[in-house]
Amino acid sequence: MSKIIGIDLGTTNSCVAIMDGDKVKVIENAEGDRTTPSIIAYTDDNETLVGQSAKRQAVTNPHNTLYAIKRLIGRRFEDDVVQKDIKMVPYKIAKADNGDAWVEVKGQKMAPPQVSAEVLKKMKKTAEDYLGEKVTEAVITVPAYFNDSQRQATKDAGKIAGLEVKRIINEPTAAALAYGLDKKSGDRTVAVYDLGGGTFDLSIIEIADVDGEHQFEVLATNGDTFLGGEDFDLKVIEYLADQFKKDSGIDLRGDSLAMQRLKEAAEKAKIELSSSQQTDVNLPYITADASGPKHMNVKLTRAKLESLVEDLVQRSLEPCKVALQDAGMKAGEIDEVILVGGQTRMPLVQEKVKEFFGKEPRKDVNPDEAVAMGAAIQGAVLSGDVKDVLLLDVTPLTLGIETMGGVATPLIEKNTTIPTKKSQIFSTADDNQTAVTIHVVQGERKQAAQNKSLGRFDLADIPPAPRGVPQIEVTFDIDANGILNVSAKDKATGKEQSIVIKASSGLNDDEIEKMVRDAEANAEEDRKFEELVQARNQGDAMVHAVRKTLSEAGDKVSDSEKESIEAAIKDLEEALEGSDKEAIEAKTQKLTEVSSELAQKMYADQADQAQQAGGQEEGQAKSADDAVDAEFEEVKDDDKK
């Protein structure tokens, strides 16, 4: 049986590893390097270059050289971060027919998974050359904070590259696997700080020995899918362009060739300043004007670089706080801090992490290779070559459905261990409702509209019944890759509908981190909204109950009584249209008072009838007491296709 390889598909660099006996081996590519730049170029003679060869010709071919494609994977063209990316890169980002963000090269549109597949193909070939046999299966890593669409798109890239993706695993978890496998002693809690080329993750992971088995349990994860080395480079590029404009009066930002040279120089300067205090950026013939050629010569000190990127490093500490809070831990309770991702080589990053956790981060983990090594270990676990490892990962955001009054009712809370399956019974909002729309949302806000809509589907042909009677079982099922399936079943008829959340409806990165931040900042607003919805639901239920009692009472109620009840109903219905909680509560109370006499009369009549019937109906009232009222849109037959 061929080996399952482990691939770290990175924003800036990628890496491939395998389990060789009981040791993990990172495989060198054809150029002799252990990592490969995630850069793809399309040349004039229709050749596709991947890795170092693509990087070398980027300066002369900026429009057809694609890098940081991982930032576009599984995203919509209209996403804020994609719009931000358009201004940052020399290649063209185009809108696909389905609204996704694609790239355009030589007049041809290409999907990000298609481009990423070229990098995966090179990783596959690297492994095949080393093993001397065909490779068809892989474990591929993704940032822990990747959403459903991004995970799906990564799987698609693997498929395009001719790989069966056996598992998608989170990068920090993979790094913890690589770190923890050869450390035999005792239980410990580690924080994996993963600052890569394009994304940032922080995971808190408990490593324990359970009956001779290494158990890796993720307690909490948080992150920012648009924060990484590319952003650090951009700060340096901006600074160099500003300095040049100040010195020569020429703005290089419109010159893609010059900007590509600046990008290369900025990355090189940033790397040099991790080991030296000062570097020179020398770029002869960067541009020219009427007076002749212009050269760039800028001195850049480590202190200057640190002042340029300090806000980015600071931004990475926010998810650290949230993850600790979610895990119910203090920074001092973390036993080890592991740094992953090339950007963690920067002294300022190491210093801030040390300051935050109060301990020196470990230096015995290779930040560029640990993730691929962890993926290879997971591959060996799946193929049965490694038997004493159990990996328990989590879903990063709360998943639920929209219920009555626009509330997001959670089914699976964030940081729930996956795979997981959860069901809950919901019901109809109106009498004789024959169809419901299940609206799936993802995020931390109480109001469904404030969260991200992942998809909708209809469950039709529900037998007509009073509201609250039908029992609709909604089931959320997250697989080990973190990919979601949702189904709804009418328990009376057994009729079922389901949906796999498709890549075209994913979240964008800003929204994800914003959701968690907003949830904290808007806790008060959410509380008021919940109270308003509660008042509305009580008012609604009161109107429904009184109307029903009125129609059952028939001529037992006098005209004057009927008039005052109808007037109170009208007042309450008007109040329900607005957003004044106090007014709704007052009108509900008024309706309760004017209808109480009628209710007592009806109750007395029923008591008499019940006595005569000998109480035979006892116990039949237990219908769907456990059902949660849910406001589903009724699906009209003529809307159906």
UniProtKB/Swiss-Prot annotation:
Keywords, comma-separated and alphabetical: ATP-binding, Chaperone, Nucleotide-binding, Phosphoprotein, Stress response
Residues that bear Phosphothreonine: 199
Name of the protein described by the UniProt record: Chaperone protein DnaK
Pfam family, one: HSP70
Family the entry assigns: Belongs to the heat shock protein 70 family.
Spans annotated as Disordered: 602-641
Low complexity composition bias: residue spans: 604-615
Database matches in NCBIfam families: PRK00290.1, PRK05183.1, prok_dnaK
Ranges annotated as biased composition (Acidic residues): 626-641
Function: Acts as a chaperone.
Record Gene3D superfamilies: 1.20.1270.10, 3.30.420.40, Actin, Chain A, domain 4 (3.90.640.10), Substrate Binding Domain Of DNAk, Chain A, domain 1 (2.60.34.10)
Gene Ontology molecular functions: ATP binding; ATP-dependent protein folding chaperone; unfolded protein binding
Expression induction: By stress conditions e.g. heat shock.
